[in-house]
Amino acid sequence: LIRLQCYEGLDTATSVYEWNFAAQMLAMRDGAGEADIYAEKYLIKRALLQAVEPHASGPPVLLIDEIDRTDAPFEAFLLEALSDFQVTVPELGVIKAQDPPIVILTSNRTREVHDALKRRCFYHWVDFPDFDRDMEILTARLPESKLALSLVFVAFIQQLRKEDMFKLPGLV
């Protein structure tokens, strides 16, 4: 699993690659005869580059978590990268996936994801658990909790989820 955690301000430098500037500077300072400071050994591979590289075990799974937290320009870049399953590192060229990754996008619906991106995905809504499932989750996470308190707590959470709230509560 390769995970790309999305956040506001995410860009290609933090999602595809960065150059190890310190190592490049040391190589130049040492004069070790390194002609190319943009060699792959100075490349820090981020999630999207890792996802398009060959993997001996077959196509990797790329989790792009909370895509709704990014901005429109990054979403447009991502749309292009996922349509061709390739990324470009200007100093090294185009790196194209031999086996396209299996991509999973998650969203908390803090904003609408662009239609062009949604058209390229299978959409599956995961609703909040019912009372019994919430109880299973709570007792699995807190087996030492008292049953009476757990019942009251889960009932309270279930009631809150019926209210008109911007963000509904979970149990995490």
Predicted feature locations:
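C-terminal regulatory/interaction module of P-loop NTP-utilizing enzymes
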Residues: L1-V172
